[in-house]
Amino acid sequence: MVFAHLDKKEYLPLAKLSALAVILLWAAAPLLLLLDIGQPLLFWHLFAYFQPESPMAWGTLILTIYPFLGSVYIWYLFRGEIQKAKVWGLIGLPIALGSHGFVGFVLSFSTARILWTTSVTPIFFLVSAALSGLALVVILDAVRYYSTLRHSPEAQARERLIFHHLGEGLYILIFADLSLILFYLMKLGLTPELFDHVLKLMTEGKLSIADLFIPLVLGLMAPLALLVAPRTARNPVSQLIASALIIFGVFFMGNLILSAAQALPLV
């Protein structure tokens, strides 16, 4: 959507498709959050008893505002009022960033969870969200490539160039994600107490090397190879496979960080 409003009109159809996907997926996100909390029927307390000093309260506010801004953006976008859509898109951009970063921000305040208490945690969740989101955009573009554009070789040729640009964004974000994972591994090696706890989890069978290396190899390194290899860099099928693997990797890597931290003893 950002490219679509930087005078790159070739991205506009993809921006419309992506914006619709955001709203549909966002409709399911609050339900998953409610299922995860211990007392879902009391979620309204976050609104009725709003505490400005609480990160959770601000996160709830952001999650509520974001779909509203997205709906207004979509309204102007599909009406062809691009300038108004651009304004609402720019207003919604920091809200979108906050909606993904606040999860890690809240976790970083959990001082009893040694794996989460770092300033890198919000950045990790933000980068992972950007990576999986861009991967979803590539999947949507692949669907468009093989459906609405299949009868137009010229349009498909132009779309392959878009695939290439999206792929460049993907592997930049993959490198960023790998760097943050490396930080977590360095923290593990440089914190004797944390290392001992993780080693105990592995010896008890609650955690294994495969839990880390499967999402790391299949979800990040394999897609990176597909995105940088000359033969596959502009191939829509390769991009589709890489994007599906990225979403798999981001999900399981995030789940690993959450579950591993909860399995460790409180400090």
Predicted segment positions?
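Juxtamembrane boundary at the C-terminal end of a transmembrane helix
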Residues: 251-267
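Membrane helical hairpin/interfacial module
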Residues: 1-62
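Long, contiguous internal "core" modules enriched in hydrophobic/ aromatic residues
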Residues: 6-15, 63-64, 69-241, 247-248
